């Protein structure tokens, strides 16, 4: 139970957020035309520039500023809507993750290794010599919110995983998490679609948790089997 604690806490936070929003009625503040008018008008009148500025913010925020991953999905959903916003977020965070990977591999290897060693579980899981487990490990760490997004990106840079495999896996396995936060944000902002958005988000969260835990158990089984064969 202890090893799933962070994932369960994450799910609990989402549920509490939904309940508090219903009780405290945060949505009117977020949907107040006076608060959003300037931003929405700017995006509408400067759509291409808005996309460019968002991508720059996301790439820099993910690779240099070490902002929490959820930040980028929330901002994208608020600016562009949940679905197209998810796409822009996925593009930006993938580029940011790859940039972090490259910085770690070619410029910051020694310092990053010392930093990653402080997170025992991440260090143990990520640093595997068996290349057959690389995509499985990448899937687990992306699906389960138990490791810091930015630290993961730098950690993979000092492993043996290829940049092609890392890029493809990162792009694919970040999709569920980005959609969750994007539609969750839409549910808070848009009163009419709130219930449906929260239901979709909750279903995806549950599926992610189930799949992530299953994959983690599979990883532990394969690791134990490999050790026994030695």
Regions found by a protein language model. Give the residues of each.
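Membrane-interfacial helix-loop-helix
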Residues: 2-10, 17-54, 94-151, 158-161, ...
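Ubiquitous "structural anchor" signal
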Residues: 74-77, 89, 100, 104, ...
């Amino acid at each position: 139970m202890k090893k799933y604690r962070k994932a369960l806490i994450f799910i609990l936070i989402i549920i509490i957020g939904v309940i508090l929003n219903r009780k405290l009625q945060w949505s009117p503040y977020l949907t107040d035309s006076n608060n959003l008018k300037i931003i929405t008008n700017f995006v509408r009148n400067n759509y291409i520039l808005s996309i460019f500025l968002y991508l720059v913010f996301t790439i820099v925020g993910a690779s240099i500023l070490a902002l929490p991953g959820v930040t980028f999905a929330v901002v994208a959903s608020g600016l562009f809507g949940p679905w197209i916003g998810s796409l822009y977020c996925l593009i930006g965070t993938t580029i940011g993750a790859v940039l972090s990977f490259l910085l770690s591999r070619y410029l910051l290897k020694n310092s990053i290794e010392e930093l990653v060693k402080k997170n025992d579980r991440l260090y143990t899981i990520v640093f595997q010599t068996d290349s057959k487990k690389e995509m499985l490990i990448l899937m687990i760490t992306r699906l389960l919110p138990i490791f810091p997004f930015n630290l993961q990106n730098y950690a993979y840079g000092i492993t043996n995983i290829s940049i092609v495999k890392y890029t493809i896996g990162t792009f694919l396995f970040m999709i569920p998490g980005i959609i969750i936060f994007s539609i969750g944000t839409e549910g808070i902002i848009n009163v009419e679609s709130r219930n449906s958005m929260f239901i979709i988000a909750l279903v995806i969260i549950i599926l992610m948790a189930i799949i992530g835990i299953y994959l983690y158990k599979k990883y532990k089984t394969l690791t134990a089997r490999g050790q026994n064969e030695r």
